[in-house]
Amino acid sequence: MITPPVAGDTFAGAPPPPSQEEDAPPYGSVVLGGTFDRLHDGHRRLLKASADLARDRIVVGVCTGPMLAKKEYAELIEPVEKRMKAVEDYIKSVKPELVVQVEPIEDPYGPSIIDDKLDAIIVSKETLNGGFAVNRKREEKGLPLLKVEVVDLLSGGAEGEKLSSSALRKLEAEKANQQEGAASKGV
């Protein structure tokens, strides 16, 4: 089901809002969220694009608790502290002047529906409806709507599948099973 856009939504390719400087990033503060397990090129692309769009601050919600329950191979997801540090370290490596706020989130919204200083939410095509849902919640709370910026994710293989932490966890589980099988056969 496609959720209709809310007033204020924009998409990649649309002109950014005017800024004080021609080359300045279009938004003061941006927000995004994700699991960020085993930080890979897809994550780095999303985080770099987000940092490039922010002038002053980037807020990143990192999923934990109930947000992980339905993930494939959830038991192999790295601890939230490790994932949060990897996100913060990467953003600081690509844009050290940004204020980086990384926090655990236990629901799909996190700080995106309470922080009135945010200007834009960064999403992938797969999470676009989540961006619209955030704006509906912000509207209900009387907060300014966020611009919605869409970043394309990288492919993870020849079949054009997106690069994913789930696929990396699956490979880790298969490798562990093969090693256990070899050990039990005395190989």
UniProtKB/Swiss-Prot annotation:
Sorted UniProt keywords: ATP-binding, Coenzyme A biosynthesis, Nucleotide-binding, Nucleotidyltransferase, Transferase
One of the GO biological process terms: coenzyme A biosynthetic process
Sequence segments annotated as region (Disordered): 1-30
Pfam families reported for this sequence: CTP_transf_like
Reaction catalyzed: (R)-4'-phosphopantetheine + ATP + H(+) = 3'-dephospho-CoA + diphosphate
Pathway(s) annotated for this protein in UniProt: Cofactor biosynthesis; coenzyme A biosynthesis; CoA from (R)-pantothenate: step 4/5
Protein EC: 2.7.7.3
Functional description taken from the UniProt entry: Reversibly transfers an adenylyl group from ATP to 4'-phosphopantetheine, yielding dephospho-CoA (dPCoA) and pyrophosphate. Does not accept 4'-phosphopantothenoylcysteine as a substrate.
Family according to the record: Belongs to the eukaryotic CoaD family.
NCBIfam families xref list: cyt_tran_rel, PRK00777.1
Name of this protein: Phosphopantetheine adenylyltransferase 1
Organism in which the protein naturally occurs: Oryza sativa subsp. japonica (Rice)
